[in-house]
Amino acid sequence: MFAFVRFLEDNVCYALPATRVREFHPHSTEDFDSRRVYAVYRSLEEEAGFPGAPQQAQILALAENKTDLENRVMQKKIKIPKISLNYSEQPWEYKDYEDEEDSEFRHFKRADGRKQVESPHKSIEAVVARLEKQSFIGPSHNTRCDEVFSEPFHSVGHMDRLEAAVVPRVLYEELLRSYQQQQQEMKHIQHELERTRKQLVQQAKKLKDYGSLVTEVKELRVLNRRLQDVLLLRLGSGPTIELQIDKSDYCDPEPEPEPEPEIQKISNEEVHLGSGVWVNEEKWHQLQATQGDSKYTKNLAVMIWGTDVLKNRSVTGVATKKKKDAVPKPPLSPHKLSVVRECMYDRIARETMDENEIAQRLSKVNKYICEKIMDINKSCKNEERREAKYNVQ
């Protein structure tokens, strides 16, 4: 078993075998008094009986082996309690002078209650002189008394430094360097966090400005599209005129909620849809009962243009990209397209008031008309194949 002891003479700690402690036979690692002063041999020669006396020491910890003891020291699990100045339980041969020592300690106190440690030797000499006058002490005991009285003062002078004796100096310096390095890293991290926070604030301001600009651009686009629709309606209110539009300059605008359509007028069993567009009254009433936006738009396109016109036209007048040698077909009349959009808007507005839903459903009008044109062309091709087959037979 090993003991971690602190010698009171020089305040140095050692890990020594427990056998070097005189008259000490522990039964476990907890069988010791940390406040008691023991007699410990510092070297093997002293223990073997060579010249040298045991020294006063304080046992701080016990362990089964030296490795466990060193681990406890490195982990700072050892505390140094204050030593008791009562040596009545210690195996020292001069414990008979304990009462005299305590009485002299009480005389070494200042008026404010603190011990006068600066001049212990003068007081010791006075005590020794008084003891010499008494015949029960011989000269051989003077040296021992001097040792007894000087040791408590020596230990009191080191009382404030007990805690520093646990951690080795190398470990302390290493921990201090690590602590200073971590402080520098923490300052650097705090600086980076502050810089990042300022950047985030600036980005948030820019994002807010960008959001307001995007909203303004959207509003301007909506107003521009409505203005285009109004102009198309005014252009189509006169005689029916097919407008010649260059395919490269024409771009069908994205649909938005349209203004309220004109009041439909019934004359000679026909219904006026606006912009000079008239349809059959009976077919118009049948169209109102149609379910689904796709079917409604396709049937309305057939009522306005007819299948013969639709099969030879396109919505935008731009050639398809699916065929390399595709020839662009003439676009449909813009004012008639606006009539289709107005009718579709009037139909959707009766079902919902959500502008987003209205805009989404209106954006599919051109798609439905394109599908109808493709269906007509497909039917015509199938009819031509059947006729060619019959002619061959």
From Swiss-Prot:
Signal peptide: none annotated. GO terms for molecular function: DNA binding. It comes from the Eukaryota. InterPro entries: BEN_domain (IPR018379), BEND5 (IPR040391). Residues 274-380 form the BEN domain. Disulfide bonds: none annotated. The BEN domain mediates DNA-binding. This is BEN domain-containing protein 5. The lineage of its organism: Eukaryota, Metazoa, Chordata, Craniata, Vertebrata. The gene is bend5.
